Amino acid sequence: RSNEVLGNQVIKFSPDGEILMTLTHAGSDSERLHWPNDVVVDPSDGDVFVAESHRGGRNNRIVHFDRQGRFIKTIGSAGSAPGQLREPHSLALDSRGRLFVGDRENNRIQIFSQSGELLDVWTQFGRPSGLFITQDDRLYVADSESGPDTGAGELTGIMKGIRIGSAIDGTVHSFIEDLEPLRDDHSGAEGVGVDSAGNVYGAVVRRRMLERHVLRP
């Protein structure tokens, strides 16, 4: 599945690249998208959640579709109050089906039920650009935009990198520092993933590379 920013749509592909479904087109009403950032699919029923919009976008919400692409509801609205969103940049589901939203411009993760109820707000993972949750509820958060107290970065006083913790209680227990932590150009990993061996991958947009961090025994 692809979230196409300029086309303002979500496209579902087969493993062979065949287009199977296209969700919506440009707009800001309840069923249309504007600059979608991320997509997550519930493996239990195939429901699709789309985060929008990117910088300057007007929607700032999560749009929920069923597996056939039919609109169900929206979650959130523009703002900084609990339950509101500013540039929701990433999505993930934990083992209980809770929806984690990387609310990047608000420097927090917000956790919702799939019915749209706000369950929790976490700020201890920095400025979240990317989220990944393993089957055992280990949470990986890519922070590409933070920086030291020198003024580098959008969220100052903490370092950019990948924070690792618990999706159950929010405890942070590990940190992978960015390779160039003092660069002031949003150059950290924006996407994050983990393979079956526990190795961590960071997608670094500005430097156009993929980092691989090997799990030590």
Can you name each region flagged by the protein language model?
Residues 1-217:
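Sequence-structural signature of mature extracellular/luminal beta-sheet repeat domains
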